Design a protein with these regions (language model features):
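RecB-family 4Fe-4S metal-dependent nuclease core
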Residues: 1-166
Length: 166
């Protein structure tokens, strides 16, 4: 009997082993702007085909999104916007790959779908900022991951940059 982790690898090979595609990147970093906000993150895997880019988000949990909800999944929508920014002349397909069940749920994002992601995303950001205390942290270990600190846009980041360039 093989372990659950080994079985996941066997299942992945069974799913992708015979396909021809280019794994463009794994843990692909993205950074794009919507309104006044920089959206920064990482996509688990990006495959490039002749006319299409497929974003693959691996899921390890048991809870799955219903197929009907994949098109409106905000995380996949953000990834699709990032891919559309990086590959403006290709179709964008986003997939949730559930490693435990082996199920893959996908949606090809149209231009209209991509536009429909933007407003809810900005609304969500505005609500988070309105409902939360987002004052800068004094913990430089946390700051090392923050673009505001790297740019010196906050007091902690500015002090850190001054020390770096003395």
């Amino acid at each position: 009997m093989i372990s659950a982790g080994d079985q996941i690898i066997v299942d992945l090979y069974d799913t992708y082993g015979g396909r021809t595609f280019d794994v463009y990147d794994k843990e692909m970093e993205f950074n794009f702007v919507i309104g006044n906000y920089s959206i920064i993150g990482f996509i688990d895997r990006v495959d490039v085909y002749d006319d299409c880019v497929e974003i693959i988000d691996y899921k390890t949990g048991k809870r799955e999104v219903a197929q009907k909800d994949v098109a409106t999944n905000l995380q996949l929508g953000i990834y699709a916007l990032a891919a559309a920014t990086a590959f403006p002349n290709k179709k964008i397909k986003a997939s949730l790959h559930y490693l435990r069940s082996g199920r893959i749920k996908s949606h090809e994002f149209s231009k209209a779908d991509l536009e429909n992601v933007k407003s809810p995303l900005v609304t969500r950001i505005n609500n988070i900022l309105k409902d939360s205390n987002f004052s800068p942290t004094k913990n430089e270990r946390v700051c090392s991951f923050c673009d505001h600190a790297k740019s010196g846009a906050c007091a902690t980041g500015a002090a850190r940059l001054k020390r770096m360039f003395k």
